[in-house]
Amino acid sequence: MRTVLINGRVLTGDGLRDDVAVVLDGDRIADVVDTASALDAERVDLGGGTLLPGFIDTQVNGGGGVLFNDEPTVEGVAAIAAAHRRFGTTGFLPTLISDDLDVIDRAMRAVEAAIEQGVPGVLGIHIEGPYLSARRRGIHSLDRLRDLDEEGLALLTSLKRGRTLVTVAPEAAPPAMISRLAAAGVVVAIGHTNAGYDEARRALDAGATGVTHLFNAMSQLGNREPGVVGAALDDPNCWCGLIVDGRHVHDATLKIALRARPWTASCWSPTPCPRWA
């Protein structure tokens, strides 16, 4: 049975439009048509609301009263998914900050099980640490940080279902390790790092493809040393995460970054998600 969604602001390839209707065929979008030519079908009035595709969030530390580090279980993943689904997030990576290897292992197995059991929206896992710089650790516990070794490499490449995104500092994960992660299908991002421009470039050349929360917990753009920020903005193939909560990054800084790397350059914008989200 076909249904037509009318009287809404619909995001299309041409921006937000209020002169189109969305045609549904069962649970699938069949067409987007001019409102005037909408089919004779059951109509749902959106009341002037905005209709958007579901959001995909690559950095979700928790939600629904659950912090993933505290509850690396299928139940924890499901609670986080349900909490964020209410706000339009239909796909996400449960994100673990620096922790012991056994906790990382439990989290990865929980994500595998969640995908197997059909928990909606789970796309894989984001492992943010423990292979980070002590100088730029932020809230990550110093006693959890370590250099990437063979044991860690084996763990990070062990996910059987979904995608693995890891955030590493080049100081703790040298180019050879980054290359091996990338070769195994792991998406590697640079973050929580005090690396200079040249070291960051070597990491990108080795297989890192992005930067986690650009500007935060990393070396900054300077006149003689461009830092990680400069390396990220200078590389057209590097995606950039941004925390756009009005606190982590100044509005002017955000605008400058978006001018330097427009949306066509695949700039991601995850936001932090505390346990009470």
Q: Which role does the model predict for each range below?
A:
Residues I127, A134-E150, L155-G227:
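Divalent metal-binding pocket/active-site signature
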Residues N61-G63, A78-A107, P120-S133, K160-E171, ...:
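Divalent metal-dependent hydrolysis catalytic cores, especially in the metallo-beta-lactamase
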Residues V74-E75, A107-A110, D149-E151, R224-V229:
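Charged helix-capping and loop-helix junction motifs
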Residues M1-I6, V10-L52:
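Histidine-rich, glycine-flanked metal-binding segment
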Residues E199-A277:
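Active-site-adjacent C-terminal substructures of enzyme catalytic domains
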Residues G8, V22, D27, G48, ...:
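Divalent metal-coordination and catalytic microenvironments
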